[in-house]
Amino acid sequence: MTTPSTRPTDDRAAGPASVPPPTALLLLRGPRERVAGWVSRSVVPLVVAPVGRWTVAVAAAGPPTGPPYDDGALLLVGRPVPARTGPALGFSETGGRAVITVHAAGRRRGPGWVVWEPGVGLVRPPGLDLAGPGEIVRLAGCPARTREELVDLLHETGPRPVTMLQAVMATLGLPGPRLLQDPVRAAELPGATRHDPSARQVSWFEDAVADSVRLRRELGVLE
């Protein structure tokens, strides 16, 4: 559980065999107490800190859950954020792609997605509800003119995924772009705390996922 009185440890001293944390962070703009409640139910280890009017949640390690729910980046940025806890913007590198998620009031099908691939640009994975640049700009609190700059940026195809994500965050004036490339720095932010999921939380998550898959198979949604 999150312990506000305990400053998180710096994992940079870990041995060479240590697995790097996922490249993912989520910026939430809801009341701090609601964000804390949301964080406390995460199965992804997180470092959380206030950054201006936002709270940043940075993936500190991969989740202890088994496949196919062992992608900590997607589990963090794709997890639904209640309207009273958001809005929120997620940024992650997953499968060699840059992924942005938009959690805003009025979205009934979960987050909106932006997926960008090097050498290709924007892609449209089937089954995902896409987010538009105007929505992202409004949620970030930027002037309307920022939309054109964001569109031009997302049409580039040369950068690496993490570089694209950092450029998007910088264009939107959002805090924390360096944390995508150096997530252990999150532990050094003022007021940073660490959340590690309990074995009970992980068990509840895996049971809920198993029940959902079983129900969908019974309904014929999954083969």
PLM region spans:
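Long, compositionally biased intrinsically disordered terminal regions
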Residues: 108-109, 117-223
